[in-house]
């Protein structure tokens, strides 16, 4: 037996928190009966519907690498009616994202049909490497010569693993930034703190997975044998 919200999340419908909201809103049925308690326990023999859609409890975990373009937000529904990642994806089953990229960021976004798999990737204790290429306007010397480890900005501590300059011209500089635990808008806030304006941010790696030659909007599925490792 497992909690109903967990089963919904594991099926790739949404996060566990969003699943709890759907239950409280009366959008979930078990064996034809509307359930209003997120604490309800179910098993594989129960038939579960979410917003009229029957979910598959026995599906195998799958993983995709997706090149998120600029201009999409990483959510299933946006109260401001902005375009979302999931509205643009075609040919995929119901999936959730592993982590997020903000509206103006692009690059590697991992997608999965398994809530459990998503949580394994997102656990801070697993310390999965995230690599970003960042283009910024301003004087790079201040950032590169500063101690940016354990940096406190507006009461939040940031601890990037490394920030290295790899290309520079008259107007912009390119940096490679490595994180092992990403916080909301972390890179943009660190750069802004040191007087640099980020005008392009691309995630090129998450864990052992890289963006390779994918074009914006394209995706590819990871082989199950690689996933099992």
UniProtKB/Swiss-Prot annotation:
Gene3D superfamilies: Alpha-L RNA-binding motif, Pseudouridine synthase I, catalytic domain, N-terminal subdomain, RNA-binding S4 domain. PROSITE patterns: PSI_RSU, S4. Its EC number is 5.4.99.-. The active site is at 102 (nucleophile). It catalyses: a uridine in RNA = a pseudouridine in RNA. It comes from the Bacteria. This is Uncharacterized RNA pseudouridine synthase RF_0863. SMART domains: S4. Coiled coil: none annotated. GO terms for molecular function: RNA binding; rRNA pseudouridine synthase activity. Keywords: Isomerase, RNA-binding. Belongs to the pseudouridine synthase RsuA family. It is an enzyme of class 5 (isomerase). InterPro entries: PsdUridine_s_RsuA/RluB/E/F_cat, PsdUridine_synth_cat_dom_sf, PsdUridine_synth_RsuA/RluA, PsdUridine_synth_RsuA/RluB/E/F, PsdUridine_synth_RsuA/RluB_CS, RsuA_PseudoU_synthase, S4_RNA-bd, S4_RNA-bd_sf. Residues 2-69 form the S4 RNA-binding domain. GO terms for biological process: enzyme-directed rRNA pseudouridine synthesis.
């Amino acid at each position: 037996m497992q909690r109903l919200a967990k089963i919904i999340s594991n099926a790739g419908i949404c996060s566990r928190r969003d699943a709890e909201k759907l239950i409280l809103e009366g959008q979930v049925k078990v064996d034809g009966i509307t359930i209003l308690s997120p604490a309800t326990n179910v098993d594989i023999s129960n038939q579960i519907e979410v917003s009229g859609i029957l979910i598959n409890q026995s599906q195998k975990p799958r993983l995709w690498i997706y090149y998120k373009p600029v201009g999409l937000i990483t959510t299933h529904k946006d109260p401001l009616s902005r375009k979302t990642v999931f509205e643009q994806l075609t040919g995929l089953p119901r999936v959730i994202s592993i982590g997020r990229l903000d509206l103006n960021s692009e690059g590697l976004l991992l997608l999965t049909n398994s809530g459990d798999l998503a949580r394994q990737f997102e656990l801070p204790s697993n310390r999965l490497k995230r690599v970003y290429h960042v283009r910024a306007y301003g004087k790079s010397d201040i950032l590169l010569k500063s101690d940016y480890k354990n940096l406190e900005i507006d009461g939040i501590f940031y601890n990037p693993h490394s920030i290295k300059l790899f290309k520079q011209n008259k107007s912009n500089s390119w940096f490679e930034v490595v994180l092992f635990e990403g916080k909301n808008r972390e890179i943009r806030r660190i750069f802004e703190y040191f007087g640099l304006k980020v005008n392009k941010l691309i995630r090129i790696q998450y864990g052992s997975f890289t963006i390779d030659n994918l074009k914006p909007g394209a995706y590819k599925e990871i082989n199950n044998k690689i996933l099992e490792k």
